[in-house]
A protein has these predicted regions:
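Pocket-lining segment of extracytoplasmic ligand-binding domains
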Residues: 45, 52-145
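Short glycine-enriched loops at secondary-structure junctions
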Residues: 1, 19-21, 88-92, 149
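Bilobed "Venus flytrap"/periplasmic-binding protein-like clamshell domains
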Residues: 5-78
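Short helix-loop capping/hinge motifs at secondary-structure junctions, enriched
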Residues: 2-7, 35-38, 111-120
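Periplasmic solute-binding protein
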Residues: 1, 24-30, 101-110
Length: 166
C-alpha cells in the first residue's frame, strides 16, 4: 500500500511484459519523466507473458507489476489485495506531452488499400461502430469477449472494459 504512482517505483522490482516493444518504451519514458532511471533506480523483470507476471504477484505480497488491461483486472480477481495504483494513460497524460499513448493501430498493405478503398472505408466505419457498441453495451460486449476467448470470464471483461481505453 506504499505505492501511489510511478514515482514510487524507485527501489522496487517491477514485473512487466512487452520488452523491446511499445510497452517497454512507454514504461521507460514515463519512469524517466518522473525522475526514475529505469536502468539504475529499480529493477524491471521482463516476463514472457502476463501469466508469468501473475505468478510473481501470487508469490510475493510486495511485488509490483505493470500490466495491460484486461489482464490487470483479471489479476486483481486472482490476487487478494492487488490494486491498480496508476493507469499508464493517466501517467502519460500527466506529463502533458500533447500526445496520447498509442498501443494499437490498423494496418493494410498499400496495394490492397489503393485497390479496395470502399472495403477500407467500410471496415473503418464498422470498426468505429463496434467501438461505440462496446462502450454502450458493456455486458453484451463482455459476453462476446468471453465467447471468443479473449478473456476467460465475461465478468472480468465487463469490469475491465472502462479501463481499456478503446
Amino acid at each position: 500500500d506504499t505505492l501511489t504512482g510511478m514515482q514510487d517505483l524507485a527501489g522496487h522490482t517491477v514485473y512487466a511484459t512487452g520488452q523491446s516493444a511499445v510497452p517497454e518504451y512507454v514504461i521507460r519514458y514515463i519512469l524517466t519523466a518522473n525522475g526514475i532511471d529505469p536502468d539504475k533506480d529499480l529493477e524491471i523483470k521482463w516476463c514472457a507473458d502476463t501469466t508469468e507476471a501473475l505468478s510473481y504477484l501470487k508469490e510475493d505480497a510486495d511485488a509490483a507489476a505493470i500490466l495491460p488491461q484486461p489482464f490487470a483486472t483479471a489479476a486483481m480477481a486472482q490476487v487478494e489485495g492487488l490494486r491498480i495504483v496508476q493507469d499508464l494513460n493517466d501517467a502519460w497524460n500527466a506529463l502533458d506531452t500533447g500526445s496520447e499513448i498509442t498501443t494499437g493501430v490498423i494496418v493494410a498493405r498499400k496495394d490492397f488499400a489503393e485497390a479496395n478503398p470502399e472495403a477500407i472505408e467500410k471496415f473503418l466505419l464498422e470498426y468505429a461502430d463496434s467501438v461505440v457498441y462496446t462502450e454502450e453495451n458493456a455486458a453484451d460486449s463482455a459476453a462476446l469477449i468471453e465467447k471468443y476467448g479473449i478473456v476467460a470470464k465475461a465478468a472480468i471483461a465487463e469490469k475491465a472494459l472502462p479501463d481499456c481505453h478503446i
